[in-house]
Amino acid sequence: DENLVLTACLLCNCKKGKGPQDLEKIKTYAKEGAEYLSKLGFSNRFCKICEEVNRYSGNAIREKESDVLELVDNFGGMLLDRPERIAFKVDEALVLLEYRNLKDKNNRYLQKFKQFVNEMQEVLV
């Protein structure tokens, strides 16, 4: 489905709490959300993609859409103001995405995503 990743972006955090959370909740919200979406009738594959938004699912073989979702979710979150911090600038967010959030992680689309973001920055300037 051509809207699979977009739909996952909208629904993958359905069980994520608001405000500061403890580490255990951070580790389980994606799985809880995927289980909830499954009960609503979403396909197993779609639910797996949503569960893999972060790396806590433990799935060794990730869906390719999960890698896209991970990039969008992490990067987008860094561009938002939070009660505990102001939003990062685009270039700062890209550095943090690569060297903190995805450090030692294999995301097959990271380089293409960075290239896309940089090209869009040039369009905006």
For the regions a language model picked out, list residue spans one by one:
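Short acidic/His/Gly/Ser-rich catalytic and metal-binding motifs that mark active-site loops
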Residues: 16-18, 59
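Histidine/acidic-rich helix-loop-helix segments that form or flank divalent-metal centers
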Residues: 5, 9, 24, 35-72, ...
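Generic helix N-cap/helix-start motif at coil->alpha-helix transitions
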Residues: 30-34
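Generic hydrophobic alpha-helical membrane-span motif
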Residues: 18-19, 79
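Short active-site segment of divalent metal-dependent hydrolases/proteases
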Residues: 15-16, 76
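Short pre-active-site segment immediately N-terminal to the catalytic Zn-binding motif
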Residues: 1-2
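Post-HEXXH active-site segment of zinc metalloproteases
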Residues: 22-28
